[in-house]
Amino acid sequence: MIKAFLFDLDGVFYEDNQLLPGANTILEWLQEKQIPYRFITNNTTLPRKKLIEKLNRLGLKVIEDQLISANYAGVLYLKKQQVKRCRLVLRKAAKADYKDFDISSDAPEAIV
């Protein structure tokens, strides 16, 4: 029995700025069958919030709890390790996911 689905996004549900055929059909089927699903992505160029906005614009209805991004996983890990100060070597937009940390080049506890 299938308990849940975990989907990659880029190339599976969309390419470039276009939703792929059948993307919403599978999600509607999963909702009808009450099978939970989540999305994962290794995209580090956009903060999670902007990525969700992009997906919604494309027609893929995604809420925050359904998306696990590489940046979000990094944030969760750093919080679990009780890191307070980090240096970010990321695109400017992606840095928004790390807003709860003290961002500093001086004596960082982690470099992302």
Protein language model annotation of sequence segments:
Residues 1-9, 13-112:
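HAD-like aspartate-dependent phosphatase fold
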